[in-house]
């Protein structure tokens, strides 16, 4: 149990990448926690936004791999925000503080929904250059909990955790997926009542994405085809919303493929970011491009051979 937490990779990550805490709101209790790794000269990095149960370090495998290839990667943990507008305003202030004009966003589940809402919120003065949406959704009504969204703040921590755990896989899973679930349960335990209540509120508050505002943004939709908290209908809705999106399909990986299928996820991220190489919106150090592209080509070949 808890293999990931004691793994050499995770310990190396914790000992080499510092966790930063930043306040951008008037309210000092609203603290953004983040890992910022890779070359600082990159002005359009890839930013990871976690699911309800996640902390910034759930993306440690992406940070280690992608920074090794020369990418600048930032993984975030949200402050306590109670509505989407407040989140978007806070995130915009954070990007201003970090002096980042435009960014690429990778959002997992709730993180993906918030990434879309932020792209929508800033559509008149765009801050999002591209989106990778992993196991994500475009309309909170799919959870059938919009009526309870206003009462999460009242619930004790154990009840909130029970709600979140209800979406974790309960059937048989392979050892890597079991390790990923253990790690996410551990991360969930580290969240306080207000953190959890606010995230569940954002996840279930009645809201949907307005696609016409973000239709010009390049999108990759990353989906897993085994057990995940998302229904087939929710996935189909995403495909309809983004008809021109690239699709990255993983046969297995459950709710947390970035932990248990990290090599595949990392490769799909690299394939997505490849289209921006050589532009001012590249997330990679120009001196690293040729070696990285060769590796991506090899990996893509492996994926297409597997699919045949």
UniProtKB/Swiss-Prot annotation:
GO cellular component: cytosol; trans-Golgi network transport vesicle
Record key words, sorted: Cytoplasm, Phosphoprotein
Subcellular location: Cytoplasm
Phosphoserine carried by residues: 304
GO molecular function: CD4 receptor binding
Pfam family, one: Abhydrolase_1
AB hydrolase-1 domain span: 87-159
Superkingdom, taxonomy of origin: Eukaryota
SUPFAM superfamilies: alpha/beta-Hydrolases
Coiled-coil intervals, chain numbering: none
Assembly with partners or alone: Interacts with CD4.
Family designation: Belongs to the AB hydrolase superfamily.
Task of the protein: May play a role as a negative regulatory factor in CD4-dependent T-cell activation.
Stated name of the protein: Maspardin
Source organism phylogeny: Eukaryota, Metazoa, Chordata, Craniata, Vertebrata
């Amino acid at each position: 149990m808890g293999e990931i937490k004691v793994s050499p990779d995770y310990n190396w990550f914790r000992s080499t990448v510092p966790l930063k805490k930043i306040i951008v709101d008037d309210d000092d209790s609203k603290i953004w926690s983040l890992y910022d790794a890779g070359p600082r000269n990159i002005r359009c990095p890839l930013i990871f936004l976690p699911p309800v149960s996640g902390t910034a370090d759930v993306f440690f495998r992406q940070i280690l791999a992608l920074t090794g290839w020369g990418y600048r990667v930032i993984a975030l943990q949200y402050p306590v925000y109670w509505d989407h507008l407040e989140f978007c305003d806070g995130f915009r202030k954070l990007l201003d503080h970090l002096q980042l004009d435009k960014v690429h966003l990778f959002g997992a589940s709730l993180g993906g929904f918030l990434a879309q809402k932020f792209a929508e919120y800033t559509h008149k003065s765009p801050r999002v250059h591209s989106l990778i949406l992993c196991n994500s959704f475009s309309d909170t009504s799919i959870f059938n909990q919009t009526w309870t969204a206003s009462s999460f703040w009242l619930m004790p921590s154990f009840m909130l955790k029970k709600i979140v755990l209800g979406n974790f896989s309960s059937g048989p899973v392979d050892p890597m997926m079991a390790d990923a679930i253990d790690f996410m349960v551990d991360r969930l335990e580290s969240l306080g009542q207000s953190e959890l209540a606010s995230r569940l509120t954002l996840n279930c508050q009645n809201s949907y994405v307005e696609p016409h505002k973000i239709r010009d943004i390049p999108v990759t939709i990353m989906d897993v085809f085994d057990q995940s908290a998302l229904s087939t209908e929710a996935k189909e809705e995403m495909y309809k919303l983004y008809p021109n999106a690239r699709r990255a399909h993983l046969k297995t990986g459950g709710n947390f493929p970035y932990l248990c299928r990290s090599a595949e996820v990392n490769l799909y991220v690299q394939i997505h970011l490849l289209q921006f190489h050589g532009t001012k919106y590249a997330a990679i150090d120009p001196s690293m491009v040729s070696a990285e592209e060769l590796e991506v080509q090899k990996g893509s070949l492996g994926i297409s051979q597997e699919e045949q």
